[in-house]
Amino acid sequence: MTATKDLQGARAAQAKRNKELITRYYDLALNQKDFAAARQYIGPYYRQHSTYGADGPEGLGAFVEWAKVNIPNMHVDFVRIIADGDYVLMHNRGKNSPGTKAVVDIFRIENGKVVEHWDVLQDVPETAKNANSMF
């Protein structure tokens, strides 16, 4: 029973660390658009599955520089964050002028660094066929 509790405690601690790491990383990279500060959280190889960026830390750096120029007012609100082992999922509200997007980002962490990223984005319409929020 103690070994099971120890394992559960270790997993919970890992999930907490991973969620904190992704929250710091994402805020620096996307909200503050500070790649130099966000770089410390990226592994030596960063595999990008999003069509918006290239592989490698340099790919993320190029995207952040592009965002500074093309979407300078973009801000992401973290709605929920879920961790499962080496994976962290974020459900976000991406605010930009004009429009808002519902975003799901998935990150894989290895040795305390972000090494892989996927995303899915959807415009938030003015009206919907139901009264349910996308968030």
What residue spans do the PLM features occupy?
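C-terminal and inter-domain tail/linker signature
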Residues: M1-F135
